[in-house]
Swiss-Prot record:
Misc. remarks from the entry: No cytolytic activity on erythrocytes detected. Not active on rat KCNA4/Kv1.4 or KCNA5/Kv1.5 channels.
Descriptive protein name: Kappa-actitoxin-Bcs3b
Disulfide bonds: 2-37, 11-30, 20-34
Record-annotated ShKT domain positions: 2-37
Keyword annotations: Disulfide bond, Ion channel impairing toxin, Nematocyst, Neurotoxin, Potassium channel impairing toxin, Secreted, Toxin, Voltage-gated potassium channel impairing toxin
Gene Ontology biological process terms, A to Z: envenomation resulting in negative regulation of voltage-gated potassium channel activity in another organism
Source domain of life: Eukaryota
Annotated site location: Important for binding to potassium channels: 6, 13, 23
Region of interest called Crucial for binding to potassium channels, as start-end residue ranges on this chain: 25-26
Signal peptide span: none
Role summary: Inhibits voltage-gated potassium channels (IC(50)=14.42 nM for rKCNA1/Kv1.1, IC(50)=80.4 nM for rKCNA2/Kv1.2, IC(50)=7.76 nM for rKCNA6/Kv1.6, IC(50)=13.12 nM for hKCNA3/Kv1.3, and IC(50)=49.14 nM for insect Shaker IR). Binds the Shaker IR channels in a voltage-independent manner.
GO MF annotations in UniProt: potassium channel inhibitor activity; toxin activity
Length: 37
């Protein structure tokens, strides 16, 4: 059930700049890239 709602590049950038930790929006929409799936 883990998938990225945003494009992969967007999610990888979000991970790089720390948005996975800081932004609920990115956690939700980049679950595959950000999260422990």
């Amino acid at each position: 059930a883990c998938k990225d709602g945003f494009p992969t590049a967007t999610c990888q950038h979000a991970k790089l700049v720390g948005n996975c930790k800081n932004s609920q929006k990115y956690r939700a929409n980049c679950a595959k890239t950000c999260g422990p799936c």
